């Protein structure tokens, strides 16, 4: 951002776009730790659908037992209705969804001895994920070190990360001075390339 700010003050639109193209190529080679957004993680329990679903299930079971129903409830259902729950409750912030996913995958892959679980109030980093993905998540969070054992490197949305962390802050200024940012980052073909 500092380099781009210097160009905004002393250069022109073409210089800025050349700088952005060069930086885009460097950015795409950075590690997840280097490109992730820092955040403080609050609301893991509040937005974890597993906690909410356990409470709902307990309430339903109490209600069912109090009515003393004589019919059996099928496996995977509650009072005859199928119950499907995801990892996150509706309205969860993106970085909290990422933290819930991280904790779930660390537990599922038995990596708890190598990587710490994210707790309420922890400082974390989060990255945007390509969608759709097998976890139906838009982000993945981690405490300090990205767990490469989870094989999520291919799911990282570097373009979205670049846009949100670098282009959007620049556009706040370039829009005011009527400069256009070439979002093809030098990858757009020309009519000459066609022939």
Provide a role label for each language-model segment:
Residues 1-195:
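DNA-dependent DNA polymerase catalytic subunits
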